[in-house]
Amino acid sequence: MKKSILFLFSMLMTLCFAQNSQKISEILENDEISKGQAAYFICVYNSFGEEDLSEKDAFDFLREKSFFDETEKSDEKISLSNVCFLIGKSANMKGGIFYSIFKSPRYALREFKSLGILPQNVEPNQKVSGSEFIALLNGFEKIAKKGE
């Protein structure tokens, strides 16, 4: 399991550099990324779609897979707890007992805190910048490598 997570995130980072530089520049320039932007990167990283996939199509695909609720919209800003949930769910994160049972953004955030990826004092509803999003992906990859 740990090897598959490591492999997944190795592929994620490889794909990050292979992606359209315009998309990467676009996300890094944002102070607050949208759910559609996060969905796009999760889909491309996990080979759920091609680089030419639109943010809306990526969001709709992940919504069908229960990553998002039916009431959520792709242009809404994404919260820190939802980013943790997207990353964890896309990597099939095992997590602690509560995350294993409930598989919710709340417990995904708590898992990221317990793994040391995030400090204990972060707020679940705070918005995430593009650079923070990439740092969370990178932080999760480092933890996955250590656990191998």
Predicted segment positions?
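Acidic helix-start/capping segments at beta-turn-to-alpha-helix junctions
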Residues: E55-F67, E76-L80
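Prokaryotic Sec-type signal peptides and long signal-anchor helices
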Residues: M11-M13, K65, L137
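Terminal recognition/anchoring or ligand-binding modules at protein termini
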Residues: A18-Q37, I42-D52, T71-E148
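Sec-dependent N-terminal signal peptides
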Residues: S4-T14
